[in-house]
Amino acid sequence: MSFTVVIPARYQSTRLPGKPLADIGGKPMVQWVYEQASKAGADLVIVATDDQRIVDAVKAFGGEVCLTRDDHESGTERLAEVVEKYQLADDHIVVNVQGDEPLIPDTIIRQVADNLANNNAPMATLGVEIDHEDEVFNPNAVKVVLDKDGYAMYFSRASIPWDRDNYAKSPKEIHHNLLRHVGIYAYRAGFINTYINWEPSALEKVEALEQLRVLWYGEKIHVAVAIDAPPAGVDTPEDLEKVRALIG
């Protein structure tokens, strides 16, 4: 199976400026992500950025990098520019790996590509079972509910499905399987352009979840349970220190 990995990387970050270039064990964060993606069996791994500092850093470690426009409103728009510049065929699989996940397992990068290849949906992603009570009502832990064939019915920051009777008795306990969404996506390249030309939906604005646009317009997203649970990404200086400690 042929697929390409694109790693959108922005220098500006409200909570951690310069995040892609943050040093972890002597290497910039974006290099850790690139190296993990390179193990997944992709034809090509590309860092997509609008910042020359990131371009220089990627070239310094021998990576492929695409300098994009600086007016994109989302990582998906940046992805579309890469698809156009590299003239990827409409049916080619593109995996979007976030640039702030230096410990992402290469196995799940391959898994999400395989997931899309084996389904008719234009888009695929992954989830993991929630095993900690703190995540149940944490709005940053996005939940997803699936139909019988593994297609997403809805994504929400709320606890879904709502177990009415059990939550009434023990509101802080996990009574049934809940699935937390993992923010890695595979797309068919042609669908990316379709997606970015849709107007943002009311639901995605309410939940602040871009993937809800796909469901709003009647398309499907297939969701598989990740074979390896990915560690949390890096959003804050505290997250960065945790990753540095893990790598040693």
From Swiss-Prot:
Record-given protein name: 3-deoxy-manno-octulosonate cytidylyltransferase
GO CC, alphabetical: cytosol
HAMAP family with a match to the protein in the record: KdsB
Protein family per UniProt: Belongs to the KdsB family.
Compartment(s): Cytoplasm
Keyword Ribonucleoprotein tagged: no
E.C. no: 2.7.7.38
Organism: Photobacterium profundum (strain SS9)
Keywords tagged on the record: Cytoplasm, Lipopolysaccharide biosynthesis, Nucleotidyltransferase, Transferase
Pathway: Nucleotide-sugar biosynthesis; CMP-3-deoxy-D-manno-octulosonate biosynthesis; CMP-3-deoxy-D-manno-octulosonate from 3-deoxy-D-manno-octulosonate and CTP: step 1/1; Bacterial outer membrane biogenesis; lipopolysaccharide biosynthesis
Gene of this entry: kdsB
Disulfide bonds: none
Function text: Activates KDO (a required 8-carbon sugar) for incorporation into bacterial lipopolysaccharide in Gram-negative bacteria.
Catalysed reactions, as listed in the record: 3-deoxy-alpha-D-manno-oct-2-ulosonate + CTP = CMP-3-deoxy-beta-D-manno-octulosonate + diphosphate
Any one GO MF annotation of this record: 3-deoxy-manno-octulosonate cytidylyltransferase activity
Record-linked SUPFAM superfamilies: Nucleotide-diphospho-sugar transferases
